[in-house]
Structures are given as C-alpha cells and as structure tokens.
C-alpha cells in the first residue's frame, strides 16, 4: 500500500540514500534479530592482557574484531580470510568498523517497563490501562497489586462496590480480598510481568470503539479530556503501520506490550568506548557502568529464581532490576540519579542525545570541518572588495593536497613523498605552485557568532607574509568585526559546485545589501567618512577661491603646485552646465560613475549622504559598478583622512562662558521647588519630576551654547566637531559631556538620580560625581552579557520554527491579501506606508484617490519609484500579498514574499527565506534593551493630553456622537464609546434633491439618488469604505477611507455631499475621552492655510456629482461659500501635479490660471488662526458627570470610614475624598435617582474627589466627581528584547483584558460568586456571557453598544484573543506593529516580511473542532498541511470533512510541533518527541533543512531543491 520499502541496514551494504525515516517500537523478536549474541557477563576487558572478556560488554565474538581483519587469538590475520569464523575464539574476521554497528542483547528474567513510556507525561502505559501514573509506578516497583481478573469480588460486605479490572490495591486490600474471593476467580499480581500481560490482552480495536461511544455519550468537559487522551494513544498504536508494505514484517502495528522490555538491546561497543589513559588508568563511558548494573542484577535474579528464594527477596531483586534499566535509559528521571565513583550522576542514554552537549546539537548539527583554520584579523586597506589576505603558512596547510598535485603536475616532484618533503623544506618551487593553486580558488571567511548570512562570505585569497588574516575594511560591518583581537576562521570549498557557488553567490562584492532591510551594509565608516567629509567641506576665502577650472586634471595640477586650496570654491563645467563647487568635491566627482546627479555629490557629504550615494549607485548601476566604486571611495577616504591630520586636542574642547551662571540659576530654581515641597504645596513625585526637568533643560541650553561655539571655532574645522558632524565617531551628546556638563545619570534600575553631574570631562569629575557615573555604567556592562544570551536563544527558537520555510513556486494564484497602512504609536509615525509597501506585490488594484483611475494593477511588484509615487499620491492603505495569506502547498510562493532584499530582485524558488527571516530578527537582538521601563506616577502636561486639534483641512462630521449641554452652555461628550468626530472632504455630491439608497452587491457598494423624474447611481468598492469597528477605533485605520453620512431611505437636498473621504478621525474614548468639551459643530468647516506643494498653474473646480467642473471666475480675495471647491495645480504639460480641497470660509489668495513658482506659496488662507481645536478635557482627572437630572444619594460613602473630608485652604470648600485602601466588600457608589424608577449608578475608584452632597438635586452634565489620572498606578512597560520574545512566544499576559467576542449591547446581570456578570446581546439574538473578577476595573456601561474586539476591562490585549475574535489579518496587523515598535524605537530597520514569515509559522497549526469522518480527534492540533491532505482524502471518498479553527502557537511550541520528528527532537524536549513518534510510527519525509543536515544529506534549498534533476550548464551567447 505504501511507496516506501524498508531498508535493512547491514554494516557492509549501507544505502547511499533514503527517502524517509520512520521511528517505531521494537518488538522483542526484532531486538533479537539485530543482536549478534547475548551479553552474559558484566566484565569489560581483561586488565592484564587488555583483551575483551568473552561474553562481556566488549566481547569480540559478539561485536566483532578489535583490529581490522584479525581474530582475537591471532589465528587468522589477512584480508583474504574475510568472513571466516575462528574455531578457537569464535570471532568472525571482518573490518573493525563493525564494532560501531553490531548490537548485542541481554535477556531479562522478568519484563521491565521502559521508563519513557511510564514517566514521560502523559504516561502511555498508564493511559492505555486507565491507571494513574503514580499507581502504575507502585505496581511496577512492587509496592501495590493490580487486579488481573476481578471475578465476583466486592470491596465491602454489602456487595455494592465492585472490584474493577485494572484496579490498584494495597497489601491490606489484597490480603482481605484474597481471603474472601480466591475461589471465585479473583486474581491480582504486582510487577512488570502482570503489566505486560495486561497490555498483551488489550484489544485495541474494541477499546477504540468503546471510547468513541463513551465520548458521544458524555457531556462533562473533564471526562471528555481524559477520554481524548486515551483515544489518542489507542489511535496512535492502531495507525502505526499505515505506510508499511503489507507483505513485510513492518505491517504489524505497534503492540502495547512492546513498551515492556524483555530483551534489552546492548549498544555497539565503539559507541560507548573504553579508552586507556597513560598511567594504566581507563576512561570509561558511563553507559558501560549502567549496563554492568543491569547485567549484575539480572544474573543475581536468575540465580535466586533457580534457588526458589523467598518471594520478598525475589521481589526486591526484580525492583532493583527495574531501577537499573530505568537508570540506563534515563538516569535521574524517577528516583535519585545513580552516581559513579566520583560522586557525579552517570550519563544515561537519554542524556547522550539531548541538550546542547547531546548528539543532535553537538555532533550532528555542528561538526568540525576539515580544510579550515583560524587566525587573528588585521585591516587590509589595500585589498580589493573581493579579496582577503591569507597568511602563506595557513595557505600552505589548507591547500596541501592541491599543492601536492600541482608539484607533481609541473614535474617538480615525482612521488607524493618527495612533494611532501619539498613542502616541509618550503622550497621556491613550492611558493610558485602555491600562487597558482590559490589563484581563482576562493576561500570562505567566517566570524563567530554567525548571526546572519553575511557572517560567512567568500573572498579571493592574496598571499601575505605574517600570521594574521587581512580583511577589507568595508566588510567589517557585515561581520561585526573590529581589529582589537578578533579571530576569524577560513574554510576552503573543495568541489567544483562549491567553488562556483562561492564565486557567484558568496563573494563579498555580491553581498552589498543587508537581507534584513535592503539597505547597503558596505558603507564607509569612521576614517573613510571623515576623509570624504573633509574633502567635501568648503572654506571661505581659501587660496584660489572663485577660480574657473576646466576639469579635474587642471584642479589636480593646481593642487599639486599649491596655488589652489582643496576647500576653495571654484567654478567648472559639468555635463555642459556651469556649476559652483569646491576642488575637493570635484575629486569626489572624479571617482563617481557618470550617472550620479549633481545634487548627490555637490554638498557636504556626511555618513548618511555617503550611504544614500552607495544605495543610489547600487540601484542604478548594479553589483560590479558598485563594488569598484566602493573600493575607490575607500581609498579616497583613507587618503584624505591621513592628509587632513585630524587629531583631538584639549583646545578643541570649548566650555561655554556662561556655564556657571546657568548652573547657579538652576540651583536657585531647585531650592525654590524644595521649599514649596517642604511647605507641602507639591507632592514628592512632582518635586522629583520638576527637579529633573530643570536639570534636563539646563543641560540642553548648555549643550546648544557649546555646539554653537564649537561649530564656529576654526570656521567649522574644529576636529571634534568634524568627527561628530560627519558621523565618523561621537555625537553631540558625547561632545556635551566633554565640554558642557555630564548631566543626569541613571541608577541600575533605570530611574534617574536627581543630582546631576555638573562637571564635564575637560574640568574633571569629583569623587561623588565619579561614583554616581559608575553606578549606572556597570549595570550597562552586566546587561550586555545577559542580553547576548537572551538574543541568542531567541534567534535559535526563530530559526527552528522557520527553517522549513522556503520559496517553492513562482505564484500560488491567490487574490487574498492583507490591508496595510502606516504604523503609528502615540501620533508619531513608526513606519510609513512607503517603507512597508516597498518590495511587495499588490493583492488589489490601487485606485488613485484623485483621478479614480487605476494607479497600479493587482500583481504589481512595488519598487522604490512606484512606492514613492504611491507615497505621494495620498493613498493611505493598500492591500498586499503576504506569506500569511499564501496558498502554496508547501513553503511560500515568490509573489507572496516579494523582493529578496539582499538582491533587490523578486525572490527565486529555492531561497531559504525562513532562515533569512529568523536571522534578520535575531541578529539585531543584541541591540535591543533588556530593561522594562518605569513610567512615573504623574500625569504629563503635553498638549496632546489635554486636547486634539485638526492638522488638515475639510469639514466636520459627527459619527454616532451624542452631546449634553451643561450649565455654561458647553457641549459635553455623552458617549463612552462607538462614536467619533471625523474631518472629511466631499467626494460625491447630489446632482438633485431625492431619496438616497445604499445596497451591497458582492465587493461593491451602490449608492443611488432617486426622485420622481430621474435616478443616478454611483459604484464604490466595499474595501474603500470605513467599517463601523474602524470608525469606533477598535481595529484598522480610517485615513483615506470613504464615509457615507446618510442611511438608506433618507431625503437629501441638492448639492449635499453623500460620499466623503476621511482625512482625520478622533474616536471616543481613545482620542477624545468621555465628558470632554466639544468645540466644533457637526458640518462645520475646518480651514487651514493651504500651500501649493508643487509649482505650476492654478485651476479652480467645483464638485458636481462625482466629477469636477471648471470654475474660471475666481479672483484673489474671494471667500469660498460652497462645499466641494477644489484647486488643481497643473504642471507645464497641463497634467495634474497636486490637488487640494478648499473648505468653506477660506480666502482665495490668487486669481484663476495664475502661475505659482514656489511650492511653499499659500494659495488659500484661514480667516482666523489655523489648527482648530476639536475637543478639550481635564488633563489631570477623569471626570464623572451626571447623565440624567435627579437626586444624588451616597452608598458606602462615609466620612472617616471609606472617605476622608478635605478642606481646600484657598476657598474653604469641603469635599469628600475616597480612601486609597478600602475594607473588603465596601464599594463606594453614587446613585442618581431620576424620574420614575430610572437610576444611574457610578462606582468610585480610590482617591476620587466628590463635588456633590448626599441629597443634592443635580442637572444633566453636572460634574459629580473627579478621579486623578496620576492615581492610575505607574505601570511597567515591557520593552526591548523581553517584549519581542513575549510576542513571539505568544505568552498569555498576566493581566490580560477581557475582550468582547461579538458586537452587541452590554447588560449587567446579578453578580455570581463575587464576580461581575456581563452579558453582550447581539442583534441576531445570540449572546455571550463573561464573569469578571472584582479586582479588574470594568470599562463598559450597562446599555452601551460594543464592537467585537473592544476591551471590557483594563489590561493588556492578548494576541490569542485578537486571533480568536478579530481573525488572522487583525493578528497580522497587531503583531507586526507591536514588534516593529520595539525595533524601530531602537533605530533598527527590519522589513515586515521577515516578521510575517515567522507569524505564518506560528499559525501553521489548526485545532480540530469537529472531526467529521477524518482520523483526527477533536481538540487535536494538526498542521494545516496534514489537515488539508486528510480532508481532501475524505472528500474524495465521499465523507464528512473535519472543521478546524486557527490557533496561535508560540515559536517554541510551534518548533516542537513540527511535522518532522528529527527536527523537533533536535530542538527541545527530545525524549517526549521521540516517545510520541515511536508509538505512532511517525514518518519523517526529510523535506526540510534541519533533518537533512542531521542526516548529512544535501539540503533541499537553492540548487539542492533540484537535487534530483540533472542540471545542464549552457554557455552564454
């Protein structure tokens, strides 16, 4: 039935290759068939003759000869006797290598349990028999009896409690039952034998059916869980032969009794060697000791059985045998570990394979490599980009075989021996041949730690004297190397394919871009930057200024003859235009390729400009041009850095003159603050923050002063200023530490010490200041060490989860995508849309919002130019293809991945993108911070925390917004959620008065206006409309989306706007809190000064329907009266360059058709001031306002009990303040009784100040109380590396928020067991119920409408909830923006696609909800691929497919849950993985990287993807 044949591995006939790998339980017969004889004695070797003992653990008769083709007694000693068995010593003459593969066995007198199947959770034997693990252990270790046949036995005398099959009894119960029921068939035993018999008697098929019936019958969740556990084990046993051939002995499924061992296999002796040390001692592998204990106990037990010893002694011996076998398989798993002679636990078989020092990670995944060497590196500034200096001594060793061949080929030596001698004597011929051998033979250099693919690159070696490897300066950044003693390893590629790959793919001149971000990594740094910066500076009045030179040759002559200064400003011709530049910049121009435009080089070149230059050259010119350009740049940089002769002198450090004055002023302010604190006017927190603010601003003022001085010094040629300004070394902050003041320092916990360091390094620090600065600095060093380990572990987990992701096909053909927009955090942009879209493929057409034409069609690959056009077009969100939505069967398709950032081209099939992604995320891990940030407990007073104001122009729309009018006549927000204020511009206006109708058809929305005479229809894309949950601020973003202000059936006037584009939105409560004051009216225009933005001719238009009509009679000074007024700036070809909406009340500043020459000209101006404030609120307090008119009453509010009375000194008013710590069960509440039986309750938080009295009459919108915001305790924000690993591990947060799962109206039910009950009722009648702990703060109100995904309580949103409620795309958005916030915050650029690849792997498993007719059980986690294949199989057979829901697994869980056994076992929890796999007879089809590396096969990526097909090379025409 299967396509696989089992390969019998014989020692001489090893298969060259195999297709799959299966793990199974071995039957006793199987073990016997492997064995070459029984090991009877515990002896190892005879210590006198040093020959192995017969029948012992190293016996030559069982395991094979010690020396090649030579029997033990020496009778047969030649190759020709191969296969002969010696009569005298019984040894077969063979190669001694067979001692690595021949196994023996030990026949155990009594069956013992394999500890993996007893103790590894869940216990497999226990689960099958339905016995608890603890009870099973008691039976196996002869402490309890297990019922084999219950007969008619009952536990009690009334015969009510029947004794069941497999019940576990203690000694007392057993004796009691034996007395009463021995004759009626009752039988119970203890030990391994009875367990083996019970397992052998199991009828698995009957058990399976019985369990399935029980499953259908039960309703209890707990019971279901235990049944499912058993079901899984039973199914695994039954399915363990699915892929075997029917005729082979593999066709028998695994049997449960095979988990008990009767024949114990013995490992081949060369795998547990015994090595003689000098001094007559022996080093022994621990396994030998463990085997010896098993053999000793087994023989003793045999003897005791023959002697018919008392039961108790035999039992004890059997128990000891069980313990000895346990220790052999997994020492220390159960009882205390067995210790050797030197008091350390012996290493058992399990320990040999697991962990960092185990077989998998130490010997199979990381091997030592032949033809390699390592040495210290030094800089090689004269090398070309693709060269490295290789010491002659190293080359001699590394290329020895090649060299020997070369010497013979050239006839210098006739024999190998002679050639070797020549090499030893290092004759001249040897060096000559070495040069030839090395030429054209690249070598690979590697610097540990190898964090990404650029840590191994190939170079052409250049032979150098000395013992150090020379490295090109520009590749240092990629290797993260410096020359303070770093070492690097050299590897020689041997095969022709390997050499070709080195030359084509790995040469350093090919690896110019970082695979993480697509930025160039070979950018000049330090000295080179300094040299180029120096060269590009301009000096006023330098020698030879304002001369006219024809070109570079003339400039060079003038420089040499000293009649022209390098910084002099000169005039010259470039590309037929006269330009002003400097002599130095012309020199730079001379090394640039011709296509570089003038504005890229004719300026002061700092590090960023040089990086941009390199990027530009690469994008325009390609690899070869860039590589040679970089070399010229490096030479120029070094040359002029030397000529500049920049050095640091104490005279360069200039201390500001009025430093003392500024410091005295600051000290005075600090004293004042301290006094007001002593008087009790401010709190200690305020005092601390204010003092820190004073010192920060003082420091900033001084730094600015100092920078001004340094900049003016020597006309900008101050050495220290040049270093910092060019970006070569140092920063403004460091200079200010040298020259202004050192500033504020941090404590090890990250908080700021309030006494600053006033001195700078030029003046020197005093003792106290020195002590303060060491305080935080040492913490920094300790952090770095810890960080490296954490970052390394994160990388390892990521690699493991993503190693099987590769590009398999060109296009999977999906139309699905994920909508992306710019990532923002607190109104600062973290990643722009332009950056996010770069190198991706569109999943939907992009429509130009201005012309409504298709800007880019679906399937377009967005390169830099297109991304730029898109960024400028004002589009706010785009749908792109991502690895998460890719439909490829295996791996990912090229289109869903996009550009391979390391090359800048569309990725090719065979690229191992998973590993690249994991490296890209892990490599900068060491640059992230470790600490969690403490935010202080004070409310900040930034403007954005008190109000929101409009940044763009348009008019206001209220979405669902309700307001109250208070006594002062102000509008107060009455909504707590699901409302927003939008700033919009019109897109479609009604051509006539009529009734609006809106209908959804598939992907389109049709808006129509109809009256008795006529009807018009407008078609919109559904995808462009803002969804209700986006408007409410629950998910997604609304910028640039469309908004429909009217509902179907409404009457609309002529010229009314019915479709609008949202330009900005402020939702309640995220951007506008409840009870804020609204300062705008619905429909009110928001006017700003509008700048042209482009040069060109002005043309005015008015919106009619969905098109623009030209308006020509517009004059300067006109005021716009009508909605829908637009201005277009047309360029010289009369194409639209820019379009602006001009709101009503704007004043026009130009006539129609006037020309604009400056893009910053204001075309239309605001009559009053710009930046209209939309809403304001109290920055320090959360206000509680009355929602109805009525009478206040207090509940649980009592002065002196739950509240304190406070008297305001200034006004003499009394108010109550709720205590911070309340007695349990006390819940202070304000109740307003309104008309009828209407009542509203407000539960008050601690520290709330109450402004009303019991029994007061109040009106709607009156302020009842205020809760100070600072009372919200300061939260620790997890940041940096811990945050990243928290997200990738998908940990459930400690204080997770409860999240609504459906849209609906909130109802509070009566509390249950001191928990609040919230019920959400949806429109369609469904409801969801939540029980919420009293400790949580509930954020919703009775009767509010809430969207799925909104928080019901405070806390952190868990990514599992995001997936469950909002789906995969929302999770995609959430995870990427959270992770990017950490990396971008540290200034690290990583492309989104890398995070997406990892997220797609975290989502690679699904949870079966309904199993249908498939072989799955509900609750199973299976990989999507297995799930899909199984469903396809069932559907073909006409059955009911399974249904599953996506689950999010952390990277560790996802890696262990890999479809490949070998890969999972080599990652973590080795024993558990192997246990499961062996019972289920799992197959590993060797499809991914890791398992192939372990087995030493070609890995299936890159050229290995086509390993089967023969590649043909063809010459290029």
Swiss-Prot record:
UniProt name for this protein: DNA-directed RNA polymerase subunit beta'
Residues noted as binding Zn(2+) 1 in the record, renumbered to the chain: 71, 73, 86, 89
Keywords of the record: DNA-directed RNA polymerase, Magnesium, Metal-binding, Nucleotidyltransferase, Transcription, Transferase, Zinc
Domain of life where this protein originates: Bacteria
Role summary: DNA-dependent RNA polymerase catalyzes the transcription of DNA into RNA using the four ribonucleoside triphosphates as substrates.
Cofactor binding, per record: Binds 1 Mg(2+) ion per subunit. Binds 2 Zn(2+) ions per subunit.
Binding site for Zn(2+) 2: 812, 886, 893, 896
Family: Belongs to the RNA polymerase beta' chain family.
Annotated organism of origin: Campylobacter jejuni subsp. jejuni serotype O:6 (strain 81116 / NCTC 11828)
InterPro entries referenced in this protein's UniProt entry, alphabetically: DNA-dir_RpoC_beta_prime, DNA-dir_RpoC_beta_prime_bact, RNA_pol_asu, RNA_pol_N, RNA_pol_Rpb1_1, RNA_pol_Rpb1_3, RNA_pol_Rpb1_3_sf, RNA_pol_Rpb1_4
CC cofactor: Mg(2+); Zn(2+)
Quaternary structure note: The RNAP catalytic core consists of 2 alpha, 1 beta, 1 beta' and 1 omega subunit. When a sigma factor is associated with the core the holoenzyme is formed, which can initiate transcription.
Annotated catalysed reactions: RNA(n) + a ribonucleoside 5'-triphosphate = RNA(n+1) + diphosphate
This enzyme's EC code(s): 2.7.7.6
GO BP terms, alphabetized: DNA-templated transcription
Residues annotated for Mg(2+) binding in this entry: 482, 484, 486
GO cellular component terms, A-Z: DNA-directed RNA polymerase complex
SMART domains tied to this protein: RPOLA_N
Molecular functions (GO terms): DNA binding; DNA-directed RNA polymerase activity; magnesium ion binding; zinc ion binding
Lineage of source species: Bacteria, Pseudomonadati, Campylobacterota, Epsilonproteobacteria, Campylobacterales
Top EC group: transferase
């Amino acid at each position: 039935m299967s396509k696989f044949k089992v390969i019998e591995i014989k020692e001489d006939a090893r298969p060259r290759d195999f297709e799959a790998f299966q793990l199974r339980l071995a039957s006793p017969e199987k073990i016997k068939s492997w064995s070459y004889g029984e090991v009877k004695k515990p002896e190892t070797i005879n210590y006198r003759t040093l020959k192995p003992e017969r029948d012992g653990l190293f016996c030559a008769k069982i395991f094979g000869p010690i020396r090649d083709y030579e029997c033990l007694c020496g009778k047969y000693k030649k190759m020709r006797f191969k296969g002969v068995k010696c009569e005298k010593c019984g040894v077969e003459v063979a190669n001694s290598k067979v001692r690595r593969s021949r196994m023996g066995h030990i026949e155990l007198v009594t069956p013992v349990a394999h500890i993996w199947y007893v103790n590894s959770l869940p216990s497999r034997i226990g689960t099958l028999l339905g016995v608890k693990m603890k009870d099973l252990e008691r039976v196996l270790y002869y402490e309890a009896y297990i019922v084999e046949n219950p007969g008619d036995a009952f536990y009690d005398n009334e015969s009510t409690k029947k004794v069941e099959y497999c019940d576990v009894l203690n000694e007392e119960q057993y004796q009691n039952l034996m007395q009463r029921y021995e004759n009626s068939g009752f039988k119970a035993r203890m030990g391994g034998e009875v367990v083996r018999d019970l397992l052998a008697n199991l009828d698995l098929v009957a058990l399976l059916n019985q369990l399935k019936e029980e499953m259908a019958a039960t309703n209890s969740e707990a019971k279901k869980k235990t049944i499912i556990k058993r079901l899984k084990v039973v199914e695994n046993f039954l399915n363990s032969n699915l892929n075997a051939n029917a005729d082979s002995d593999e066709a028998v499924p695994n049997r449960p009794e095979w988990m008990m061992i009767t024949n114990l296999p013995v490992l081949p002796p060369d795998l547990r060697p015994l090595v003689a040390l000098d001094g007559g001692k022996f080093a022994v592998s621990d396994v030998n000791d463990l085997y010896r204990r098993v053999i000793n106990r087994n023989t003793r037990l045999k003897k005791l059985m023959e002697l018919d010893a008392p039961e108790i002694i035999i039992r004890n011996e059997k128990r000891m045998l069980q313990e000895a076998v346990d220790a052999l398989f997994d020492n220390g798993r159960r009882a205390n570990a067995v210790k050797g002679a030197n008091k350390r636990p012996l290493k058992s078989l399990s320990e040999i394979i697991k962990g960092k020092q185990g077989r998998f990670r130490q010997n199979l995944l990381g091997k030592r490599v032949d033809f390699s060497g390592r040495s210290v590196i030094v800089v090689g500034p004269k090398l070309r980009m693709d060269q490295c200096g290789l010491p002659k001594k190293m080359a001699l060793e590394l290329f020895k075989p090649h060299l020997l061949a070369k010497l013979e080929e050239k006839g210098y030596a006739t024999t190998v021996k002679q050639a070797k001698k020549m090499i030893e004597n290092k004759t001249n011929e040897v060096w000559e041949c070495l040069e030839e051998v090395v030429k054209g033979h690249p070598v690979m250099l590697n610097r540990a730690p190898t964090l990404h693919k650029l840590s191994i690159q190939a170079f052409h070696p250049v032979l150098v004297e000395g013992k150090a490897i020379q490295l090109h300066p520009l590749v240092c950044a990629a290797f993260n190397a410096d020359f303070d003693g770093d070492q690097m390893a050299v590897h020689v590629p041997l095969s022709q394919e390997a050499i070709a790959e080195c030359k084509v793919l790995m040469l350093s001149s090919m690896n110019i871009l970082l695979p993480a971000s697509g930025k160039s990594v070979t950018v000049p740094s330090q000295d080179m930057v300094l040299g180029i910066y120096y060269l590009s500076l301009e000096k006023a009045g330098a020698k030879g200024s304002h001369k006219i030179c024809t070109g570079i040759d003339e400039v060079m002559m003038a420089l040499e003859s000293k009649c022209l200064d390098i910084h002099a400003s000169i005039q010259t011709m470039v590309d037929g235009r006269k330009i002003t530049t400097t002599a130095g910049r012309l020199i730079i121009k001379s090394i640039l390729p011709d296509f570089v435009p003038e504005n890229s080089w004719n300026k002061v070149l700092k590090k960023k400009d040089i990086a941009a230059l390199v990027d530009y050259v690469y994008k325009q010119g390609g690899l070869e041009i860039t590589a040679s350009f970089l070399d010229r740049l490096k030479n120029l940089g070094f040359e002029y850095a030397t000529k500049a002769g920049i050095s640091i002198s104490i005279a360069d450090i200039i201390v500001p003159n009025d430093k003392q004055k500024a410091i005295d002023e600051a000290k005075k302010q600090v004293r004042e603050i301290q006094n007001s604190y002593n008087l009790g006017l401010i709190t200690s927190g305020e005092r601390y923050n204010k003092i820190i603010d004073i010192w920060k601003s003082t420091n900033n003022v001084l730094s600015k002063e100092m920078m001004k001085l340094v900049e003016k010094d020597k006309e900008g040629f101050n050495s220290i200023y040049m270093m910092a300004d060019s970006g070569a070394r140092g920063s403004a902050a460091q200079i200010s530490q040298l020259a202004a003041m050192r500033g504020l320092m941090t404590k090890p916990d990250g908080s700021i010490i309030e006494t600053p360091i006033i001195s700078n390094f030029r003046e020197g620090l005093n003792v106290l200041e020195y002590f303060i600065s060491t305080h935080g600095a040492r913490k920094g060093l300790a952090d770095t060490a810890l960080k490296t380990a954490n970052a390394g572990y994160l990388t390892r987990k990521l690699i493991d989860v993503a190693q099987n992701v590769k590009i398999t096909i060109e296009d999977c053909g999906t139309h699905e995508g994920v909508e992306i927009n710019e990532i923002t955090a607190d109104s600062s942009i973290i990643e722009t849309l332009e950056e996010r879209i770069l190198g991706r493929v569109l999943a939907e057409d992009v429509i130009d919002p201005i012309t409504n034409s298709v800007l880019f069609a679906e399937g377009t690959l967005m390169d830099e130019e297109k991304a730029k056009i898109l960024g400028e077009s004002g589009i706010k969100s785009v749908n792109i293809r991502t690895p998460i939505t890719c439909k490829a069967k295996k791996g990912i398709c090229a289109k869903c991945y996009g550009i391979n950032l390391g090359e800048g081209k569309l990725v090719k099939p065979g690229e191992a993108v998973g590993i690249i992604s994991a490296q890209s995320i892990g490599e900068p891990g060491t640059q992230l911070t470790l600490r969690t940030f403490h935010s202080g407990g004070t409310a900040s007073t930034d403007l954005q925390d008190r109000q929101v104001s409009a940044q763009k122009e348009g008019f206001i729309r209220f979405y669902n917004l309700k307001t109250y009018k208070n006594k002062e006549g102000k509008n107060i927000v009455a909504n707590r959620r699901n409302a927003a204020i939008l700033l919009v511009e019109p897109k479609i206006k009604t051509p006539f008065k009529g009734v609006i109708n809106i209908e959804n058809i598939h992907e389109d929305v049709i808006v129509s206006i109809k009256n008795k005479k006529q009807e018009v229809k407008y078609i919109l894309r559904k995808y462009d409309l803002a969804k209700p949950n986006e408007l409410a601020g629950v998910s997604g973003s609304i910028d640039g989306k469309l908004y429909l202000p009217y509902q179907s059936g409404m009457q609309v006037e002529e010229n009314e706007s019915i479709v609008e584009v949202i330009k900005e939105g402020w939702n309640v409560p995220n951007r506008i809190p409840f009870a804020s004051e609204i300062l705008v009216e619905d429909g009110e225009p928001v006017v700003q000064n509008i700048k042209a933005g482009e040069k060109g001719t002005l043309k005015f238009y008015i919106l009619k329907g969905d098109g623009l009509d030209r308006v020509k009679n517009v004059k300067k000074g006109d005021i716009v009266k009508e909605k829908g007024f637009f201005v277009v700036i047309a360029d010289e070809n009369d194409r639209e360059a820019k379009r602006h909406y001009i709101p009503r009340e704007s004043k026009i500043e130009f006539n129609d058709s006037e020309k604009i020459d400056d893009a910053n000209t204001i075309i239309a101006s605001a009559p009053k001031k710009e930046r209209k404030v939309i809403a304001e609120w109290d920055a320090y307090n959360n206000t509680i306002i009355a929602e109805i008119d009525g009478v206040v009453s207090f509940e649980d509010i009592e002065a002196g009990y739950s509240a304190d009375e406070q008297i305001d000194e200034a006004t003499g008013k009394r108010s109550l303040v709720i205590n911070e710590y309340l007695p349990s069960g006390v819940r202070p509440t304000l109740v307003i009784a309104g008309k009828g039986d209407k009542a509203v309750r407000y539960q008050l938080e601690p520290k709330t100040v109450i402004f009303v009295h019991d029994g007061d009459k109040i009106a709607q919108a009156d302020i009842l109380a205020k809760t100070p915001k600072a009372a919200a305790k300061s939260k620790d924000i997890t940041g940096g590396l811990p945050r990243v690993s928290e997200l990738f591990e998908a940990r459930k947060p400690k204080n997770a928020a409860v999240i609504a799962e459906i849209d609906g109206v909130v109802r509070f039910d009566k509390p249950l067991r001191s928990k609040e009950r919230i019920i959400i009722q949806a429109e369609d009648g469904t409801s969801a119920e939540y029980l919420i702990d009293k400790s949580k703060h509930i954020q919703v109100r009775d009767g509010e409408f809430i969207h799925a995904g909104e928080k019901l309580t405070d806390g952190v949103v868990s990514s599992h909830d995001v997936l469950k409620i909002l789906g995969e795309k929302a999770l995609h958005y959430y995870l990427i923006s959270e992770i990017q916030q950490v990396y971008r915050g540290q200034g690290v650029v990583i492309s989104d696609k890398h995070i997406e690849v990892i997220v797609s792997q975290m989502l690679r498993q699904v949870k079966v909800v309904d199993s249908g007719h498939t072989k799955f059980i509900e609750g199973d986690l299976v990989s999507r691929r297995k799930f899909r294949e199984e469903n396809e199989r069932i559907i073909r057979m006409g059955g009911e497919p399974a249904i599953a829901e996506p689950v999010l697994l952390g990277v560790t869980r996802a890696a262990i849950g890999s479809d490949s056994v070998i890969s999972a076992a080599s990652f973590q929890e080795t024993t558990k993985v192997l246990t499961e796999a062996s019972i289920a007879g799992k197959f590993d089809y060797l499809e991914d990287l890791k398992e192939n590396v372990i087995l030493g096969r070609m890995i299936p990526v890159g050229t290995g993807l086509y390993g089967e097909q023969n590649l043909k090379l063809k010459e290029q025409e």
